């Protein structure tokens, strides 16, 4: 890996449900995911997460809770994706479809894991248990995990 790029991912969690967005275009199109993207130059990771949540879902948030940090490697790509994962429980506004994402609430026992990124089934249970985690996933392509490591951490 020659370079890495900072990304954010925000999961809006409320009692018994989570807000996911159907990615409509670009990388990961056709999958449900949290809200996030690239951190822009001059922006903190948390500010980038808040901006992406607002742009993609129409929701604003006062407080984010950092819950995870995962690096993603894709065979053939020189760039490592350095993803900082946050949860938000109190948001302002109503989820609104954007050019990039179509938000939808899911009951926690009905999360569509078959239509999420394959790695989500490994770390999402930790998120729902309010545990913090770090990891690395190596993908052959967007559907195939070659190897991974994942561990709980006490704090960031």
UniProtKB/Swiss-Prot annotation:
Question: Any binding details for the cofactor?
Answer: Binds 2 Mg(2+) ion per subunit.
Q: Which UniProt keywords apply?
A: Cytoplasm, Cytoplasmic vesicle, Hydrolase, Magnesium, Membrane, Metal-binding, Nucleus, RNA-binding
**GO terms for MF:** 2-hydroxy-ATP hydrolase activity; 2-hydroxy-dATP hydrolase activity; 8-oxo-7,8-dihydrodeoxyguanosine triphosphate pyrophosphatase activity; 8-oxo-7,8-dihydroguanosine triphosphate pyrophosphatase activity; ATP diphosphatase activity; dATP diphosphatase activity; metal ion binding; N6-methyl-(d)ATP hydrolase activity
Localization per Swiss-Prot or TrEMBL: Cytoplasm; Nucleus; Nucleus membrane; Cytoplasmic vesicle, Secretory vesicle, Acrosome
Amino acids binding 8-oxo-dGTP: 8, 23, 33, 35-38, 52, 56, 100, 117-120
Tissue specificity, per the record, is:
High expression levels detected in thymus, liver, spleen, kidney, testis and large intestine, with lower levels detected in brain, heart, lung and stomach (at protein level). Expressed in kidney, liver and small intestine.
Pfam families, sorted: NUDIX
Q: What is this protein called?
A: Oxidized purine nucleoside triphosphate hydrolase
In which organism is this protein found? Mus musculus
Q: Recite the lineage of the species.
A: Eukaryota, Metazoa, Chordata, Craniata, Vertebrata
């Amino acid at each position: 890996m020659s370079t890495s790029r900072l990304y954010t991912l925000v999961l809006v969690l409320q009692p018994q449900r989570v807000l996911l967005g159907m990615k409509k275009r670009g990388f990961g199109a056709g999958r449900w995911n949290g809200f996030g993207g690239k951190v822009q130059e001059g922006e903190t990771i948390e500010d980038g997460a808040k901006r992406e949540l607002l742009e993609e879902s129409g929701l604003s948030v006062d407080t984010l809770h950092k819950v995870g940090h995962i690096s993603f490697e894709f065979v053939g790509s020189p760039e490592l994706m350095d993803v900082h994962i946050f949860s938000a429980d109190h948001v302002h506004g109503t989820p609104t479809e954007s050019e990039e994402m179509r938000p939808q609430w899911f009951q926690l026992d009905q999360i569509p894991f078959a239509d999420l990124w394959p790695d989500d089934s490994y770390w999402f249970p930790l998120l729902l248990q309010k545990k913090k985690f770090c990891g690395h996933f190596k993908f052959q392509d967007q559907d195939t995990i070659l190897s991974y490591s994942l561990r709980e951490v006490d704090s960031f």
